[in-house]
UniProtKB/Swiss-Prot annotation:
Molecular-function GO terms, alphabetical: 2 iron, 2 sulfur cluster binding; iron ion binding
Organism expressing this protein natively: Leptolyngbya boryana
Alphabetic keyword roster: 2Fe-2S, Iron, Iron-sulfur, Metal-binding, Nitrogen fixation
Protein name, UniProt field: Nitrogen fixation protein NifU
Lineage per the UniProt record: Bacteria, Bacillati, Cyanobacteriota, Cyanophyceae, Leptolyngbyales
The record's free-text note on cofactor binding: Binds 1 [2Fe-2S] cluster per subunit.
Superkingdom to which the source organism belongs: Bacteria
Length: 205
């Protein structure tokens, strides 16, 4: 149940109009909070209150808008308003929301282009030795994975490398987050497979 996303909820209901997608977001957050409370686990909140306030009408910050845009692949201001209500009041923040969306899209395109170039380069490289593989894994974790997790209150540490199995320790918010499995696969394993070897498997210890 902890792996249920707002998109899963919307799909289970047979699809929701965009104007009602904020209900699925609220439902997912409520489900997560209820499960954590039942298990006696303190809920790890996203660091939304520490970012710049974008929509004063509904109290929505820049980090929350960025997170929702990234997680749901949003491309328009109207979609953001449907998902988190930001921009649905006085409208003075619409330009700021558009800037956030543009920045996220630009980042994705830049990352995709860089990854494509790196994959092409990797295809002509000689096979990595164990020492080279471990060093490259550590480099990718330090430079590309950890900064993203730290920004969201978490962290990851390389524990061991056994063949193609990369063992890591999740820390901070990532250690108790309901989405820790998704973090391993999407944020850590996917990045290492692209940057180091496509056969790597990441495991938490």
């Amino acid at each position: 149940a902890l792996n249920v996303s707002n998109q899963d909820i919307a799909a289970f209901l047979g699809g929701l109009p965009e104007a009602k997608m904020h209900c699925s977001v609220m439902g997912q957050e409520a489900l997560e909070a209820a499960i954590f409370k039942y298990r006696g686990i303190e809920v790890e909140h996203h660091e939304e209150d520490e970012g710049a306030l974008i929509c004063s009408c509904f109290g929505i910050s820049e980090p929350k808008i960025r997170r929702v845009v990234i997680e749901n692949g949003l491309t328009t201001v109207e979609q953001v308003t449907s998902y988190v209500k930001a921009g649905g009041g006085c409208g003075s923040c619409l330009a700021d929301i558009e800037d956030i969306i543009t920045a996220v899209i630009d980042e994705k395109e830049t990352t995709a282009a860089r990854i494509a170039a790196e994959i092409s380069e990797a295809q002509i490289r000689k096979p990595l030795t164990n020492v080279q593989k471990i060093a490259l894994i550590q480099k990718v974790l330090d430079e590309e994975v950890r900064p993203v997790l730290i920004a969201d209150g978490g962290d990851v540490e390389l524990y061991d490398v056994d063949g193609d199995f990369v063992k890591v320790t999740l820390k901070g918010a990532c250690g108790s987050c309901a989405s820790s499995t998704a973090t391993l696969k999407d944020a850590v394993e996917a990045k290492l497979r692209l940057r180091v070897l496509p056969t790597l498997v990441v495991q938490a210890v």
